[in-house]
Amino acid sequence: MSRAYTSDPRVLAIDPSTRGFGFAILEGPNRLIDWGVKETKTDKRKRSLKLIADLIEQYQPSVLVVEDYTRKGSRRCRRVRELIKDISRLAVQQKIKVRSFSRLKVKQAFSESGASNKYEIALAIAERFPELAARLPRFRKPWMSEDYRMGIFDSVGFALNCFSFSSPENISA
């Protein structure tokens, strides 16, 4: 995707999961360019890195955002933690800045708007970006698995944190 002139940095946020990864591309805090979930069934690490490299090539982000899995509250399995490291290395190799935020940081940012859990954060994101409303999973009961589409909302949350907590010179190309 060719990049139209804008003073806002383009941010690619990735949220790996056991099924693949959710992603969101934002240009500034109010312009959602693309979003989705990429599923990987075999050779998940290699396939995920290939799909992420394709997103980087297509959208040419100035910043890549991932979860800071080292912080309290992260429950990532070893494979996903290793994948996050590999994603960060891929971005650095392509001279893209890498930022990471804990889920707690995202929760704190959205608590100002009254959102206190992942579902309420997703609702707040869908309100901010109505184009995501159709992808909003229904409320999850304790015995239910998390809907794969939640990766989209987690990614948008990470990207918005990048704009909220980073100084402009740290996210500009």
Enumerate the language-model features and the residues they cover:
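Phosphate- and other anionic-substrate recognition elements at nucleic-acid/protein interfaces
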Residues: 1-173
